Amino acid sequence: MSFFNMVKPLIYKTDPELAHDLVDLAMRTARRCPLFFNPLVKANFVDDVMLHQKIWDLEFKNPVGVAAGFDKHATMVYGWPALGFGWGEIGAVTPKPQPGNEKPRAWRHIEYEAVQNAYGFNNEGVEVIKKRLKKIYPFILPIGANIGKNKTTPEERAVEDYKILVNELKDVVDFFVVNVSSPNTPGLRDLLNAEFISSLFGELKNLTDKPILIKFSPDMEDELIINLANYSVLAGADGIIVTNTTVNYDLVNSEIKRGGISGKPLAQRSYEVLRIVAGEVFGKVPIISVGGIDSAEEAYKRIKAGASLLQVYTAIIYKGPGIVGEINRGLIELLKKDGYSHISEAIGVEIPKKLENKA
């Protein structure tokens, strides 16, 4: 039995938010102790040429990244390699500090291997996070910033919040992710429309040459997903992340009707949305898949469906801190088994080809 499996019962008796704060503390402490930190990097970080990719002129050592929400305040970046991550996303960051929603705001659904969170973009604000990133940037791994509007900012002024964030962070991160799909900020998902996306990307593209991605909700109708995928690319999005958390509480029989569900129950819908988006924009912009990825097999399934990169978070809670390394090592074996010499050969191989109009 692994050490993680031995301590899991104790971890699950701890408040989810407190447990996360303890992980944050451990990550920040570990990097100051090479005798502990270096063996973790050696055990978990997979650096194999089969998984190397160059995307947006950035070097990715492996495809598995830190999902937004894990490192909200950019306090754990130094520790990413110790968990095996090849890149990551900090935040969500807002212009002004905000405490987020009232506690409790995180719940485990252990029998479903899921987490429900209603944090509400709690973060220290862009000024503090910018100072923190200045000390480490450029980092050995690509760093993205997940950016969102403050809760108190009205929808009609949302673009201004995103402009502030890009201006402040453009010299300390490698790319941006526009978050308009979190269920935890009232009215935020209403911004997932063509008019706002056009206005937003039109403004942000004038501020930076760095890639700007958009993250989709899994709760949109398929037709809207198709339309927004195409429109996002036309508006200038450099990539699409699918998906954010879901508000389908029936997936975990939750009596708590707030926040978003992540983890294994989201896997099927996240995969479906990936297939829809890939069917529309694969080859035009890179697609990142997140939601319920907890094994090499699931990761490989997403890659074959069109994902160039992947993200995990909840899997660490249920599978342990070695899961990213396991996924990457497993991916190499699966690629070899199918006769591939590089991950790029497998990306999108299962995307159905559209029937050509023979008229």
UniProtKB/Swiss-Prot annotation:
The name of this protein is: Dihydroorotate dehydrogenase (quinone)
Q: In which pathway does it act?
A: Pyrimidine metabolism; UMP biosynthesis via de novo pathway; orotate from (S)-dihydroorotate (quinone route): step 1/1
Q: Which residues bind FMN?
A: A68, G69, F70, D71, K72, A92, N146, N179, K215, T243, G263, G292, Y313, T314
Task: Please state what class of enzyme this protein is.
Answer: oxidoreductase
Q: Which GO terms describe its cellular component?
A: cytoplasm; plasma membrane
Q: Which reaction does it catalyse?
A: (S)-dihydroorotate + a quinone = orotate + a quinol
One term of GO molecular function? dihydroorotate dehydrogenase (quinone) activity
The record's section on NCBIfam families has: PRK05286.2-5 (NF003652), pyrD_sub2 (TIGR01036)
Query: What does it do?
Result: Catalyzes the conversion of dihydroorotate to orotate with quinone as electron acceptor.
Q: Name the family.
A: Belongs to the dihydroorotate dehydrogenase family. Type 2 subfamily.
Active site as annotated: S182
Q: What is its main location?
A: membrane
**Keyword Phosphoprotein (UniProt):** no
Q: Which Pfam families match?
A: DHO_dh
Q: How is the cofactor bound?
A: Binds 1 FMN per subunit.
Q: Which domain of life is it from?
A: Bacteria
Taxonomic lineage is:
Bacteria, Pseudomonadati, Campylobacterota, Epsilonproteobacteria, Nautiliales
Q: Which UniProt keywords apply?
A: Cell membrane, Flavoprotein, FMN, Membrane, Oxidoreductase, Pyrimidine biosynthesis
Quaternary organization: Monomer.
* Organism the protein comes from: Nautilia profundicola (strain ATCC BAA-1463 / DSM 18972 / AmH)
- Single GO biological process annotation from the record: 'de novo' UMP biosynthetic process
Annotated substrate binding lies at: K72, N117, A118, Y119, G120, F121, N179, N184, N244, T245
Protein's cellular compartments: Cell membrane
* Membrane topology designation: Peripheral membrane protein
Query: According to the UniProt entry, what is the EC number of this protein?
Result: 1.3.5.2
Q: Cross-referenced InterPro entries, in alphabetical order? A: Aldolase_TIM (IPR013785), DHO_dehydrogenase (IPR050074), Dihydroorotate_DH_2 (IPR005719), Dihydroorotate_DH_cat (IPR005720), Dihydroorotate_DH_CS (IPR001295)
Q: Which cofactor does it need?
A: FMN
